[in-house]
Amino acid sequence: MSTEQDVVRKAPLFTALDEAAAASLRASMDSVKIVKGSVLFAEGDEGDHLYVIVEGKLKLGTSSGDGRENLLSILGPGEMFGELSLFDPGPRTSTATAVTDAKLLSLGQEKLIPWLAENPDVALHLLARLAQRLSLIHI
């Protein structure tokens, strides 16, 4: 199994994938490289992609009213972010900035929907995991 495929299977929404489903999903994803200090997306940008970190670290933050940054999280390999935008495209609620050079896998809504249609058993698990994550943030 490739490192990227292993990272996909460890991402919270995709833990139930078997090797074949993980390989199929990985084939639907795009590789993204970002250099230290670069902004992947900014708070308020439109979004419809989730990202899984393969290598490196990113930080998620928001801007306060007085212009200061509120750090939400530092994320590393195997962690995922942006998943809500797959089902509710709209403005991003935070800014994602590379803390180190990083390699990511990106999955857009336009590729996820057909993949789920081909893997309906995974779709139910995905919805259950998404509901779990939402309950953790009290939405």
Residue ranges of model-derived segments:
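Cytosolic regulatory regions built on CNB/CRP/Popeye-like sensor folds
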Residues: 1-139
